[in-house]
Amino acid sequence: MAVTMADITKLRKMSGAGMMDCKKALTESDGDIEKAMEIIRKKGQAIAAKRSDREAAEGCVLAKKDGEFAAIIALKCETDFVAKNEDFVALTQAILDAAVANKCRTLDEVKALPMGKGTIQEAVTDRSGITGEKMELDGYCVVEGAYTTVYNHMGKNQLCTIAAFNKESEEAAHNIVMQIAAMNPIAIDEAGVPESVKEKEIQVAIEKTKAEQVQKAVEAALKKAGINPSHVDSEAHMESNMDKGWITAEDVAKAKEIIATVSAEKAANLPQQMIENIAKGRLGKFLKEVCLLNQEDIMDGKKTVRETMKEIDPELQILAFKRFTLRAE
């Protein structure tokens, strides 16, 4: 049976495959559209399998709400060209629509939903085969509450945020999802920050404070000996500054002795209570930066998010939020 241009065009619209692939599939199936579709699907699955070890760093991130339920999903691919393709964005939207309509709470539930003649996962695999790029679903997260809101940062499908509240407040809700997008908090308040994170931060703060105290003592001792600390702060600088004639070999030897002696003495005699107090202050600063309600309001730098919410509605509470981006931060 001869393959017509009308059949090729029809198959291309149905499958999204290229003209030549459609022609080959129709020729192989003797003009049978359904069989040609299956040939294209199988070929696409084989191509997708070969690309499974590639990195999918680009993609499309979308968010949607339906009453008390809101979700984010990302369909990832390899190139920005595919990520901005209308069919790719439409597929991402269709997947999100299905996920929200079915109130899916896990990515596995989303993948198992029906789409076309198979599942959503199979639809993604089919599209991967057609484009020749690795594709995978990622970033699926949900929030639930009396009122939900979503935000797609600058409409670029790269960063989305969602949040749930105990009651409706459109103005506050919109400002907060923008705040989450801009400031990337890890918790609503201090209670939501895992103890393991707090413990890690306090240890980092303690070690940093100790190092700073030792460094101050070393610099003071070097200056007292008539040596510029910046000239001897590394082996490379010592060599370079000797070549320039800024310091002598004797200066370097003396500096090394001072650095070793003072560092050891200061480290052994650091005031523990002072170190802990400084570290606690740094932990407090960290918690202010990573807790949403403690953050400086991006819309009004003179207030915290908590203060702004209280002004808008004293009874308003944020129950949960999620944020997903394809970009490293």
Swiss-Prot record:
One of its GO terms (molecular function) is translation elongation factor activity. SUPFAM superfamilies: Elongation factor Ts (EF-Ts), dimerisation domain, UBA-like. Residues 79-82 are annotated as: Involved in Mg(2+) ion dislocation from EF-Tu. The keyword Coiled coil does not apply. Disulfide bonds: none annotated. It comes from the Bacteria. InterPro entries: EF-Ts_dimer_sf, Transl_elong_EFTs/EF1B, Transl_elong_EFTs/EF1B_dimer, Transl_elong_Ts_CS, UBA-like_sf. Keywords: Cytoplasm, Elongation factor, Protein biosynthesis. GO terms for cellular component: cytoplasm. It is found in: Cytoplasm. Associates with the EF-Tu.GDP complex and induces the exchange of GDP to GTP. It remains bound to the aminoacyl-tRNA.EF-Tu.GTP complex up to the GTP hydrolysis stage on the ribosome. Belongs to the EF-Ts family. This is Elongation factor Ts. It comes from Parabacteroides distasonis (strain ATCC 8503 / DSM 20701 / CIP 104284 / JCM 5825 / NCTC 11152).
